[in-house]
């Protein structure tokens, strides 16, 4: 795979992939607020559907409908995409932070669960991803 294929500076979250389909500004604002909540709550591992819905003063089902309408993803898949994008950013921008600690910061208690989720998303492990992006 080419380095450009994994350049996080040019990647979009799944909900951004269909930017050519204009959405109501309220969807964009809603998604932005959800992303902020997920990132802020990752270290404390309080980024589940119930916690996020509660933080937005929504019921779980209402939250599920809104996030799916705005992104085309289930809440779980959307949360995972935000976690992986943040992990990729930390791996590239914070070279002094251990990979295990990047996983913890992104809400993964288990290093192997983090590695497996990262591989599924990016097609390579976090160490390989970091090395690829820091060999510039």
Protein language model regions, located:
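Append "Primarily bacterial transcriptional regulators
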Residues: 50-59, 63, 67, 101-109, ...
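…primarily DNA-binding HTH/wHTH and HhH modules…
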Residues: 6-17, 21, 116-136
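Basic, amphipathic alpha-helical hairpins
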Residues: 26, 33-47, 67, 71, ...
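Coiled-coil-like amphipathic alpha-helices with heptad-repeat character
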Residues: 59-60, 78, 125
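Short, Lys/Arg-enriched, Trp-marked, Pro/Gly-tolerant hinge/linker segments that flank
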Residues: 2-33, 56, 69-77, 81
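Terminal helix-turn-helix DNA-binding modules in bacterial transcription factors
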Residues: 50, 69-109, 132-136
């Amino acid at each position: 795979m080419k380095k450009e294929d994994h350049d996080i500076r040019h990647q979009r979250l799944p909900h951004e992939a269909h930017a050519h389909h204009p959405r109501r500004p309220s969807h964009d604002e809603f998604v932005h607020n959800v992303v902020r909540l997920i990132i802020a709550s990752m270290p404390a591992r309080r980024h589940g559907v119930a916690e996020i819905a509660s933080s937005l003063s929504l019921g779980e089902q209402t939250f599920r409908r809104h996030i799916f309408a705005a992104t085309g993803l289930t809440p779980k898949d959307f949360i995972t995409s935000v976690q992986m994008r943040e992990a990729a950013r930390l791996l590239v921008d914070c070279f002094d932070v251990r990979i295990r600690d990047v996983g913890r910061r992104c809400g993964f208690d288990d290093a192997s669960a983090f590695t497996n989720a990262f591989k599924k998303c990016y097609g390579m492990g976090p160490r390989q991803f970091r090395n690829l992006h820091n060999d510039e």
